[in-house]
From Swiss-Prot:
Name assigned to this protein: Cysteine--tRNA ligase
Lineage of the species this protein comes from: Bacteria, Thermotogati, Thermotogota, Thermotogae, Petrotogales
Cofactor note: Binds 1 zinc ion per subunit.
Similarity field: Belongs to the class-I aminoacyl-tRNA synthetase family.
Gene (UniProt): cysS
Keyword Thylakoid belongs to the record: no
Amino acid sequence: MKRFPTIKIYDTLSGQVVDLVPVKEGEIKIYLCGPTVYNLLHIGNARPIIIFDAFRRFLEYIGYKVTLVQNFTDIDDKIIEQAKKENLPFEEVGKRYIIEYWRDMTALKARAFNFHPKTTNYVDEIISYIKELEEKGYAYKAENGDVYFEVEKFSRYGELSHRKVEDLKVGVRVEVSEYKKNPLDFALWKASKEGEPFWESPWGKGRPGWHIECSVMSSEILGDTFDIHAGGNDLIFPHHENERAQAIAKSGKDFAKYWMHNGMIRMAQDKMSKSLGNVWYLRDLLKKFDSDVLKIFILSKHYRIPIDVSEELLRNQEVSVNRVKESLNEAETFFNGKVPCPQKMNYFKEQEEYLISSLSNDFDTPSVVARIFELSRDLNKALNSRDEETIKNNYYIIRNIYGSVLGVFETNEQIQKNNVELNQLMEIILNVRSALREEKLYNLSDYIRDNLSKIGIEIKDTPEGTKWS
């Protein structure tokens, strides 16, 4: 039986640094709240992607099987508003910005997560989920046609945000409605207004509320109880509090065992957000800076603290990142293009132990980033003195251990290797689907297409053949 190192993380629910004990030994399942796809990603959206891409890589490095889900919210008030501005169907807005998301992820050189479900692919499951909450007495239909979750019926409400219900009623910003029994009650289903998209339901025409989608998609893909729910700390209340309430009310189980939240990115001390209009789009940033500059900038600060960002701060980071890149390039030149793999010595083992010890301590990436810079300085000294053993050791550690785990300073070959498994799997799936269509087994062919769509993979049959994205 494999022995795993003890990993400590800060759990928002308990308010303490705790040992991460998986629900199932050897496996860790994570749900990360994703973007509402009505605009381009900004640097604030990129922070959790960078953090949890690295966290996933670390868990895999020490031997865990990791399933990481990030959703797309593709039906929402903001999307409807954007569709009106552009005079487009709301579906087209969502599709466009999901495509732009993947372009930005490619430019960021971030690995795709295991599943990227879309809300609109889970409306039937959402309706069933709400019906069950209604049957159990946690939901009610209001006079305006909306269906609300009744907070007073759930005695554990406020546990995640560490607030009491009576305190929450005063001074907390929630969606106001005269039709609610309690100001804290939140919409599970919103009745459609004229000109808005809708789905048929037992409560009339409408669409899902914001909070219900994540509870449904996470439970459908990861099960009623999974290991970690993650996201920005601005989501703790009300979004994650509401997610947790409706999930536990429905299943009677604990939903996410642990909750991890990253701090915000600020411009001039203000939280960055599209709605505030003070955003720095990731695409524009990556035209000015290499993706490693942004990744190192974010990973050099602890994931839970807020980060102030400016072009000057990123320029300063760029200088140190370029020094590392130059030392790695010089090492490759020293060995005529390919640095030989070193023998596993005590030094090699010590560096690996430092990596694991640091990242097991509430994901202390700043210590690992600092060690990369230290190793790079030693690499430069070794290049000057032509110390071949140190050159090989430090190059390998930066490229293949520290860099590979954090997702920085990777070669093109390493980046391509990260994507090859999905491409190979999709080739097999499409070949199977083509064989089914040749046998006129269209129901099975459509089943594959529809279920791939649920996890964010779109299949299109064209005259030139079947394509996926």
